[in-house]
């Protein structure tokens, strides 16, 4: 099975309406069956200063989410977008997945950045989402920003059957670490033998590129830019493998979850 994916970056603002306009402009360039991934906080906006949360209009955010959901269903595409959202009085850093069949999936970031702690609540499990495509079902895992530094999370997603791992990123202002973050993403792909698609906020100094990496660790597309840009790649899922995972010495070192529902 081959998937067509669009990894989109743009300068994420604190204006929900402006972000939605740009997201919509990207969706207009898709074709049925596409998978589309946007950065962390792409709709709500994002900042390392948590005061930005006070500016989020929940009604405007809800309207934006509904618009993306309708467009995903109408265009027959799967869209993943970053959203900081208040649920039952708690803030979560999330990735919302809008499926071509009208379903919505949500991942709540489990490993928060230092400036997020005490402000955001953490997610409590690492789900693998099974999505329908015209050619069959595809299993996808999600990670957000700094979670690229925790390979055990990626390894768990792979062991739970994820074929593609999407990484919604918002890492800017210090490009001296760009080679480090790029290396992390290449390693996450190669060690799990999964496709990794990472969409970063567009900025003059990106900490990490917007990038697509194949299961063998080869970079199949990369963007380093402060502008709206789109990376279109084809993913041959036959390249996904458990060759290395099956050679793990799980009798000595094993990855396990404290949440038994994670691989459901």
Name what the model sees in each region.
Residues 60, 64-78, 149-228:
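CN hydrolase (nitrilase-like) catalytic-core segments centered on the catalytic cysteine
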Residues 86-160, 173-183, 245-249:
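Active-site catalytic loop in hydrolytic enzyme cores
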Residues 128, 201-264:
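C-terminal beta-strand edge segments of enzyme domains
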């Amino acid at each position: 099975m081959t998937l067509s994916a669009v990894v989109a970056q743009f300068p994420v603002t604190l204006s929900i309406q402006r972000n939605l306009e740009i997201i919509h402009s990207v969706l207009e360039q898709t074709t049925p069956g596409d998978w589309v991934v946007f950065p962390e906080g792409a709709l709500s906006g994002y900042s390392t200063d948590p005061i930005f949360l006070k500016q989020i209009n929940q009604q405007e955010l809800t309207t934006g989410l509904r618009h993306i959901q309708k467009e995903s269903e109408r265009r027959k595409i799967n869209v993943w977008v970053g959203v900081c959202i208040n649920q039952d009085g708690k803030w979560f850093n999330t990735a919302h997945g809008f499926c071509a069949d009208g379903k919505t999936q949500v991942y709540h970031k489990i490993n928060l950045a230092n400036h997020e702690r005490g402000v955001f609540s953490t997610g409590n499990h690492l789900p693998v989402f099974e999505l329908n495509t015209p050619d069959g079902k595809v299993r996808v895992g999600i990670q957000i920003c700094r979670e690229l530094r925790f390979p055990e999370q990626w390894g768990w997603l792979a062991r739970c059957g994820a074929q593609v791992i999407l990484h919604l990123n918002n890492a800017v202002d210090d490009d001296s670490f760009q080679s480090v973050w790029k290396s992390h993403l290449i390693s996450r792909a190669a060690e799990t033998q999964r496709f990794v698609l990472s969409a970063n906020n567009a900025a003059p100094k990106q900490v990490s590129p917007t990038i697509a990496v194949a299961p063998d660790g080869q970079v199949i597309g990369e963007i380093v830019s402060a502008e709206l840009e789109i990376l279109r790649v084809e993913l041959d899922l036959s390249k996904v493998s458990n060759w290395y995972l099956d050679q793990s010495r799980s009798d000595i070192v094993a990855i396990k979850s404290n949440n038994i529902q994670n691989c459901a």
